Each structure stands twice: as C-alpha cells, then as structure tokens.
C-alpha cells in the first residue's frame, strides 16, 4: 500500500473517532425545536434560544430579563413539575402536528400529554414575546442574580 493511502486512511480514522465523541441532540429537543418553528416560522430555535437570558438554555436562576426569558422560566418549571410526576421530559417523545402556525398535541400517555403541554405552552408564549438580541449570550453571573 502506498504511504499516501495510509495517510488518507489514518485521517478518516481520526475523523471518525472525533465524530464518535459528539453527542447527538436528544430527539425531544429536536421535536421541541420543530414545535417552536411551527409558531415562529423561519426561526432557528436551537440557535436563537440556546443561551438567551437567565432561563433559555442550560441556566435557570435569577430574575428573567424579559418576556422571552419568562417563557423559558415557565417551561423549566413545567418540566420540573413533569419530573415530579415521574416523567422524564428530556427523553419523552410525543406526537403532535402543526396546522397553519398552531401546534396541536396528539399525545397518548400521561407523560406525553404533560411534556407536550409544556412544549406547546412555551412555543405559543415565545411566539407572542419580543426577541431582544441584547439578551443573547449575556453574562449570567452578573445579570441572573
């Protein structure tokens, strides 16, 4: 085998090792994102809301910075309540459909109904809230006390 072929194979191998360490997005997060796209066509929820304010994304403390952040706070609280009822919101998949900008839940189990209801409420809430670019990627240590 030629040395150039070995280098190509080594490159492919290293690339595959790196890709194997990238965790996939939970299916519920993708489903949730699509529900938001139903109420806010053209949005990119995974980018727009990933690090917005004190509650949209991984953080969840302090005083919400605006209505968008209050929507995310309510969603966090709804997921907490679902967890208190024995559900696993981040892992729960459900059926829903979108009709002219309005999502509808078609959930079957109690946990699907609960989680779909949480996602439905925040999707509608975000659609009615004004997005402020200044609240994206804020210093949560300073602003979320």
From Swiss-Prot:
UniProt tissue specificity: Expressed by the venom gland.
GO molecular function: calcium ion binding; calcium-dependent phospholipase A2 activity; phospholipid binding; toxin activity
Disulfide links within the chain: 38-98, 54-144, 56-72, 71-125, 78-118, 87-111, 105-116
GO biological process per UniProt: arachidonate secretion; lipid catabolic process; phospholipid metabolic process
Compartments in which it is found: Secreted
Signal peptide positions (record): 1-19
InterPro entries with a match to the protein in the record: PLipase_A2, PLipase_A2_Asp_AS, PLipase_A2_dom, PLipase_A2_dom_sf, PLipase_A2_His_AS
Gene3D superfamilies for the chain: Phospholipase A2 domain (1.20.90.10)
Propeptide: 20-27
Keywords assigned by UniProt, alphabetized: Disulfide bond, Neurotoxin, Presynaptic neurotoxin, Secreted, Signal, Toxin
Transmembrane segments: none
SUPFAM superfamilies membership: Phospholipase A2, PLA2
Function: Snake venom oligomeric phospholipase A2 that has potent presynaptic neurotoxicity. Chain C is not itself neurotoxic, but it is essential for the neurotoxicity of textilotoxin. Chain C possesses a very low phospholipase activity.
UniProt family annotation: Belongs to the phospholipase A2 family. Group I subfamily. D49 sub-subfamily.
Stated name of the protein: Acidic phospholipase A2 homolog textilotoxin C chain
């Amino acid at each position: 085998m030629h040395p150039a072929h070995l280098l190509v194979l080594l490159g492919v191998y290293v690339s595959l090792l790196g890709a194997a360490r990238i965790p996939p997005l939970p299916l519920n997060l993708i489903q949730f994102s699509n529900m938001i796209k139903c109420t806010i066509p053209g949005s990119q929820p995974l980018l727009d809301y990933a690090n917005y304010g004190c509650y949209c994304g991984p953080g969840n403390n302090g005083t919400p910075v605006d209505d968008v952040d209050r929507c995310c706070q309510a969603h966090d609280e709804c997921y907490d309540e679902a967890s208190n009822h024995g559900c696993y919101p981040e892992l729960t998949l459900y059926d829903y459909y979108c009709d002219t900008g309005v999502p509808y839940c078609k959930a079957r189990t109690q946990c699907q109904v609960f989680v779909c209801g949480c996602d439905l409420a925040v999707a509608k809430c975000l659609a009615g809230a004004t997005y402020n670019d200044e609240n994206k990627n804020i210093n949560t240590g300073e602003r979320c006390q």
